[in-house]
Amino acid sequence: GWKPRHVTLHNQNGIIAAVPCYLKYHSWGEFIFDWAWANAYDQAGLTYYPKLLIAVPFTPITGSRLLIQPNQDRTALQKRLTDAVSLLAEEEAVSSVHWLFTTENETAQLTQAGLLPRVSNQFHWDNAGYDSFADFLGALNAKKRKNILRERRRVRDAGIRFSWRTGHEATPTDWQHFYRCY
């Protein structure tokens, strides 16, 4: 599902800029739901896949997608990178190019370069100073607190278990499982 087609720019010392690009033959694992687009293409007799995706696989984290060494001319390299991505899209005959979860600054730069921005919503929870989950629950009214506790009890009673792992804690088996999920 994620065929790497990264764009890189080099000088005599090595890579100076890159864009993480993937050919996608489905929309799983992106956290952006474009099934309606794929369906519309199909109804019009067009092919939606493959598409070119600029993203970090399996994560909806906003971050830079125009990866440029700090000692380089950012403006010039941004143009070269976006031109290279457009050329790659033509070479691969993709239906479209999707830059996912770019920073506000990069979104503005890509829009200025003539790309259409994607507008979507993402919800974030900010800790308002709670020291524990119990502190968070204590700030809720009784009905909300009771509903959350009931939902968590149902999950536990169903035998569902979960654990948190950061990247360096994930084992090769974990990574294989993550990949199968998407």
PLM features per residue range, with description:
Residues 1-182:
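N-acyltransferase acceptor-side catalytic subdomain
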